[in-house]
């Protein structure tokens, strides 16, 4: 396939996208609740995200709406297809299968009804990398990809050219396989992306983390501050490598009810 011109637009599921003019890093930061009391604003205010602070006033910085229900898979697939759950088909973590009479996890890519932005851009000649924390999400995001680098930090020790289009990731990153329930699982994603961008000319890089830290720590807590300080360092590295950066979240961490038991909508 011939790579399309940078002036061309690509149509995916009824929406038009510009061809990247520089390596474009899109980060879905799992559970990173926005707003004045959210994780990033709090980390900036407390001095743990100096790079992010420097970018806020000269970049687009807005609060957007997430897809409902506000689950990880639902929102990741909404981001990467540009559609809503009723169109892309991933409408929850599981559903009740009336034919089998039991709950069925929606991790299989057969439930995805439309093409991802990755698939369409790859077919147009784009060089793409998709790196996730968890393997189950990697399988959904990587549907129909044939050339793109696509792996999870959870399974970084078993990546291979046939399935992931990359090998020896632990050596590339110079880090051990991270524990699943740790901040390291997300940091490995960023570290791997930096090395891949240094090594290859990429067009689109999608990184999706885990919300382990957000479940463990409220905004401003030590674990959260350490995590966002780490993230800030990698954002700075992506910027130094000439990347366009887009940072969003799949959902927040607010409770479903208020202290009096009323719904917190």
Identify the meaning behind each predicted range.
Residues 2-3, 82-218:
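His/Asp/Glu-rich, glycine-adjacent segments
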Residues 2-59:
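Active-site-proximal N-terminal segment of extracellular/periplasmic enzymes that hydrolyze or transfer
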Residues 26, 51, 226-264:
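Metal-dependent active-site segment of extracytoplasmic phospho-/sulfohydrolases and closely related
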Residues 26-28, 204-208, 246:
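Structural motif
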Residues 32-33, 210, 217, 251-253:
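Catalytic metal-binding/acid-base residues of hydrolase active sites
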Residues 35-82, 127-129:
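Short, structured active-site-proximal loop/turn typified by the sulfatase FGly-forming signature C/S-X-P-X-R
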Residues 38, 216-221, 258:
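Short acidic, glycine/proline-rich loop/turn micro-motifs
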Residues 56, 122, 239-240:
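Anion (oxyanion) recognition and catalysis
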């Amino acid at each position: 396939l011939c790579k399309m011109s940078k002036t061309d637009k690509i149509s995916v599921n009824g929406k038009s996208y510009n061809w990247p003019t520089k390596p474009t890093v899109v980060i879905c930061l799992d559970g990173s609740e926005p707003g004045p009391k959210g994780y990033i604003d709090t980390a900036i205010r407390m001095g743990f995200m100096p790079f992010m602070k420097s970018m806020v006033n000269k970049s687009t910085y807005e609060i957007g709406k997430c897809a409902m229900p506000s689950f990880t898979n639902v929102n990741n697939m909404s981001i990467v297809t540009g559609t809503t759950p009723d169109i892309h088909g991933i409408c929850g973590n599981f559903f009740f299968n009336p034919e089998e009479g039991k709950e069925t996890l929606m991790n299989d890519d057969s439930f995805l009804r439309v093409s991802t932005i990755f698939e369409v851009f790859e077919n147009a000649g784009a060089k793409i990398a998709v790196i996730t924390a968890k393997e189950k999400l990697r399988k959904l995001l990587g549907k129909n990809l044939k050339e793109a680098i696509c792996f999870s930090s959870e399974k970084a020790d078993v990546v291979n050219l046939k399935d992931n289009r990359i090998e020896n990731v632990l050596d590339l990153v110079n880090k051990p396989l991270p524990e699943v329930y740790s901040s390291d699982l997300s940091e490995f994603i960023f570290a791997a992306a930096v090395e891949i961008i240094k090594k290859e000319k990429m067009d689109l890089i999608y990184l999706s983390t885990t919300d382990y830290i957000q479940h463990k720590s409220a905004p401003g807590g030590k674990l959260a501050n350490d995590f966002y300080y780490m993230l800030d360092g990698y954002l700075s590295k992506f910027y130094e490598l000439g990347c366009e950066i887009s940072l969003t979240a799949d959902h927040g961490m607010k409770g479903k009810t208020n202290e009096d038991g009323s719904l917190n909508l």
